[in-house]
Amino acid sequence: MNFETGQDKTSNAPIPKDKLSELIKSTYDNLERSGNASVDQLLKSLLEQLNSHSSLYKYIVSISTLETGSETIDSENCTMSNAIGASWNSRKDGLFNYDLPDNEHRGVKHLVTVIWVAK
């Protein structure tokens, strides 16, 4: 199952969309390998890396988790919704959604949202 992420606003992203995707995926993969892949640790690691990339922005990271309790995620038997609203300058601020794959088939999906706001 894939999350629908058509609402991205990445045209003004401080990090290119492909690099942001890789940052999220590699951070999660590294945490999984070290046995420390908690949502809290993922948030902390992502924010540290984003802050070191550019001091011209403030970053907000949101992680929505979907657990089905089964090894496969069946899009007909689960629902997740997450809404984020903001008042910002659309020329400088934006957001990006990334669907972390369930590589180990544990029935857990994470949707990571990165928001940047110009200082």
Swiss-Prot record:
It is found in: Cytoplasm; Cell projection. Signal peptide: none annotated. Keywords: Cell projection, Cytoplasm. The keyword Glycoprotein does not apply. It comes from the Eukaryota. GO terms for cellular component: cell projection; cytoplasm. The keyword Chloroplast does not apply. InterPro entries: Tctex-1-like_sf. Belongs to the TDA2 family. This is Topoisomerase I damage affected protein 2. It comes from Zygosaccharomyces rouxii (strain ATCC 2623 / CBS 732 / NBRC 1130 / NCYC 568 / NRRL Y-229).
